[in-house]
């Protein structure tokens, strides 16, 4: 009986301590020029993308993405695209991450994102068919 209790406690502790990065995370901050920026990073199974935009206007600033893996608290990303530094494409970067239920932190550069989505399927999940568009106020359907 003691073995089963010990096994249960061990498994429970492991499941509590290993939070998933899967989902969406958001961070708001000031650029070096004093402009308010928002970055959103989305992690799915094995792929991530981060986009940065101006908080006030929504204007696009920067994006990168690629594959990722997590070994303990070390995340490794292989860059597949980078709008600001195309020479990074194909490179790998590794860094320490701290993940809990609500935050994703990179302690090396003091950055912290807040969870905005847990990655579970929502009402809009699935394939979409774009059957038309609006141009100059006129609706065109396929």
Feature map (PLM): residue ranges:
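Short, conserved beta-turn/loop elements at beta-strand boundaries and strand-helix junctions
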Residues: 71-75
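Lipid interaction determinants
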Residues: 16-63, 76-142
